[in-house]
UniProtKB/Swiss-Prot annotation:
Keywords: Aminoacyl-tRNA synthetase, ATP-binding, Cytoplasm, Ligase, Magnesium, Metal-binding, Nucleotide-binding, Protein biosynthesis. Its cofactor is Mg(2+). Its main location: cytoplasm. Mg(2+) 1 binds at E406, E413. The gene is lysS. Belongs to the class-II aminoacyl-tRNA synthetase family. This is Lysine--tRNA ligase. Homodimer. It comes from Staphylococcus aureus (strain MSSA476). The lineage of its organism: Bacteria, Bacillati, Bacillota, Bacilli, Bacillales.
Amino acid sequence: MSEEMNDQMLVRRQKLQELYDLGIDPFGSKFDRSGLSSDLKEEWDQYSKEELVEKEADSHVAIAGRLMTKRGKGKAGFAHVQDLAGQIQIYVRKDQVGDDEFDLWKNADLGDIVGVEGVMFKTNTGELSVKAKKFTLLTKSLRPLPDKFHGLQDIEQRYRQRYLDLITNEDSTRTFINRSKIIQEMRNYLNNKGFLEVETPMMHQIAGGAAARPFVTHHNALDATLYMRIAIELHLKRLIVGGLEKVYEIGRVFRNEGVSTRHNPEFTMIELYEAYADYHDIMDLTESMVRHIANEVLGSAKVQYNGETIDLESAWTRLHIVDAVKEATGVDFYEVKSDDEAKALAKEHGIEIKDTMKYGHILNEFFEQKVEETLIQPTFIYGHPTEISPLAKKNPEDPRFTDRFELFIVGREHANAFTELNDPIDQKGRFEAQLVEKAQGNDEAHEMDEDYIEALEYGMPPTGGLGIGIDRLVMLLTDSPSIRDVLLFPYMRQK
């Protein structure tokens, strides 16, 4: 082993050898359960102690799980066995299970995985329990669990050893069960709306579809540089060109950026695209879908986050980005006529900007630095500047802005969507402008994607598209303060 064993570990190794000496497999085999702990409680907790005595002949059950508590001396003892659904008490008596199985019970340690067959009864205190008729060791645990009263206190250890966190922290288990349900309800909602789930490549020849730094890899056989995808977007829009009119993909995306409570280098997104729709339709879909998910998974569209009630049930606010900035700062960007004027306003209001930034970038900085964190209740911010929205369609009434929106809840972006740019000539011009930005030092600017331009030249119908960061949505719906709380195995720095 890579570390010195402590006394408890040595004792468990000795017990392991004793089991082998007795011809007992310490790592067991299949065990047929009659149900989970919750199933037993649902079926039998309704009866009184006396009624369970009368029904004993019909109450034979079989459960399996991990020993979490153990007490008792002499010829009988109690324990709590934990499975996916929770815990249930067991009662083991020597005259019920026999000498050999009672010896197994006496030598069992906390953390061991056991199987119990028996009948249901209630103790004098009214706790529903299983009276063991047969006790089986299924897996010998060679390491002691964290202290049962204090659990796993080191937050970093919880992330590094998620399996221990799940064993000792019921809230963590509930969070990840709900994460699975959230994704399932998202699928159910979209499938019922006629969307088709698809799969597209994770390794791209060009890093496109978002403003982000990619991870770079190399294909040895082809001697080719490839990029882990930073977005799913451009492949899905190729499918819209091909006639798949309503598509979505749920998958991993990779961005070579910082790690924080909101960011992980790999994360899960859903992107969807609907032909013959625009960003207003996608706004309606987003609101309806998130509300549906909350109701189905949590039973309510009013959720608690960090002590605040977030109302997903009422109609969500819709606010143009210029109006949002004006409300917060008094600056009306409709009246700003030049980049120089925008830069002067930024200096006046203490907005940090780069020298290369234009009108649209500066408006966005005003929003991010003065408005974003104030948007606690669900708010659609729409009308983003063209300079920062290279894949979105320009607004026909004011081409400085696009038909795009972002969804903000609890001061964080949760979704990004727009009426897709389907004009190949305009799209090529936008890509060329991005190349200029890249040459000026913007590492997150888009590359030119000639193949995507060619696809657009065959004709893409008017289309609405949406991207949602699933991890942030799960954070919201599970009241989790950090993205690491909703990722089973978040990225951690090497020790």
